[in-house]
Amino acid sequence: MIVFVRFNSSHGFPVEVDSDTSIFQLKEVVAKRQGVPADQLRVIFAGKELRNDWTVQNCDLDQQSIVHIVQRPWRKGQEMNATGGDDPRNAAGGCEREPQSLTRVDLSSSVLPGDSVGLAVILHTDSRKDSPPAGSPAGRSIYNSFYVYCKGPCQRVQPGKLRVQCSTCRQATLTLTQGPSCWDDVLIPNRMSGECQSPHCPGTSAEFFFKCGAHPTSDKETSVALHLIATNSRNITCITCTDVRSPVLVFQCNSRHVICLDCFHLYCVTRLNDRQFVHDPQLGYSLPCVAGCPNSLIKELHHFRILGEEQYNRYQQYGAEECVLQMGGVLCPRPGCGAGLLPEPDQRKVTCEGGNGLGCGFAFCRECKEAYHEGECSAVFEASGTTTQAYRVDERAAEQARWEAASKETIKKTTKPCPRCHVPVEKNGGCMHMKCPQPQCRLEWCWNCGCEWNRVCMGDHWFDV
């Protein structure tokens, strides 16, 4: 396979590697080409510095992935760790964990309700045991953590790749202090920090972006993250068709209702045909949960890209028209025109101005929308079919299609509260000796007794199943 190397943020060049090629071997190839010592090179990928003893497969490097290699003399205490030698983080029983690669970060837990604080980093599902597709590297999971809308060759929703760059020099040479644990960490600028490894760059702020994971991409090709779309790892039924499908869209209502993408497309087109989208002054033209839940309008309007190009163009047109109407304007009634106009409040005669090729020149009556006339309008008909009709959803289907309910059931079956801080902690095999993952707590306690870890627990039921 081919990976592209950008040395000291210059133009990239291809390097041929195998899945079992080590990072140090990659350094040696680059060092020979650039005429520099291999031990002064640092390989940066997806916000993480890659260790010498890791392989291309370990690092989730795919065909035509772009890695950054910078030349920086080692500072005291760094060289041993980078070589894969006596790194205290690798000691058996050590409590410190390697910062998780962005290629394996899962933010789907952050669609849980606000009262489930902490689960994004504490609760991990076991539903990723799908067998890898044919042709994928051994052991590589097909679980997708992110979804994007690819405006490039795909023109559809695709699995996405999370990447990070330095907000100062805009190069992907920043190593994160810690990985993101929720969508806010990724979507809110300057929320996460790190250290830029580019020479002479003092940058410390992280800037995240997404790429389409279905095809090789260049540095400049980015895609918009659709953070309401998630892999259906909890096997929730769709609120409309009641099938279990994946991926799904999880509405931001209190129940976190789930809808499959085909039904979401149908829901949007139906509402669009009836012009029953909601115009929100802050958000724009949007839709609420299909069950009509309060405070559930979709905030990231790129989710409506699921409509496809033709329907999305209609959505944008109707949204612009609705904006004009909300501002007190009118639409030209001549067939084939429909231009938005903003006449004076007491102006009865409205002319669709033909300047700049935008208007048709038609003069019409503001009251009856017919060709302009003197005197009273002959008839004014009330528009028919403008009443909002509820999208029919079966109550039982709505009850079963809740992301929140599956989460709470998982928590109930696989977790116990920490005796000190009461945060839910998952036990997935292993011994009875637990350690609270909350940095402010870190209590060592017994899963069996529910009390602080002691010699009695150690001698009596340390390794009970």
Curated annotation (Swiss-Prot):
ZnF endpoints (RING-type): 141-225, 238-293, 418-449
Family stated for the protein in its record: Belongs to the RBR family. Parkin subfamily.
UniProt domain Ubiquitin-like: residue ranges: 1-76
Protein keywords: Autophagy, Cell projection, Cytoplasm, Disease variant, Endoplasmic reticulum, Isopeptide bond, Membrane, Metal-binding, Mitochondrion, Mitochondrion outer membrane, Neurodegeneration, Nucleus, Parkinson disease, Parkinsonism, Phosphoprotein, Repeat, S-nitrosylation, Synapse, Transcription, Transcription regulation, Transferase, Ubl conjugation, Ubl conjugation pathway, Zinc, Zinc-finger
Residues the record lists as binding Zn(2+) 3: C332, C337, C352, C360
GO cellular component, one term: terminal bouton
Disease: Parkinson disease: A complex neurodegenerative disorder characterized by bradykinesia, resting tremor, muscular rigidity and postural instability. Additional features are characteristic postural abnormalities, dysautonomia, dystonic cramps, and dementia. The pathology of Parkinson disease involves the loss of dopaminergic neurons in the substantia nigra and the presence of Lewy bodies (intraneuronal accumulations of aggregated proteins), in surviving neurons in various areas of the brain.
SYT11 binding 1 as annotated region, ranges: 204-238
Phosphoserine: modified positions: S65
Name the UniProt record assigns to this protein: E3 ubiquitin-protein ligase parkin
Substitution effect: G430D: In PARK2; loss of self-ubiquitination; impairs PINK1-dependent localization to dysfunctional depolarized mitochondria; impaired E3 ubiquitin-protein ligase toward ZNF746
Residues annotated to bind Zn(2+) 5: C418, C421, C436, C441
Impact after mutating S65E: Phosphomimetic mutant; still requires PINK1 for activation. PRKN is activated in presence of phosphorylated ubiquitin
Gene3D superfamilies listed in its UniProt record: 1.20.120.1750, 2.20.25.20, Phosphatidylinositol 3-kinase Catalytic Subunit, Chain A, domain 1
Modification Phosphothreonine, positions: T175, T217
Activity regulation remarks: In the autoinhibited state the side chain of Phe-463 inserts into a hydrophobic groove in RING-0, occluding the ubiquitin acceptor site Cys-431, whereas the REP repressor element binds RING-1 and blocks its E2-binding site. Activation of PRKN requires 2 steps: (1) phosphorylation at Ser-65 by PINK1 and (2) binding to phosphorylated ubiquitin, leading to unlock repression of the catalytic Cys-431 by the RING-0 region via an allosteric mechanism and converting PRKN to its fully-active form.
Entries under Pfam families matching the protein: IBR_2, ubiquitin, zf-RING_12, zf-RING_14
Binding residues for Zn(2+) 1: C238, C241, C260, C263
Known EC number: 2.3.2.31
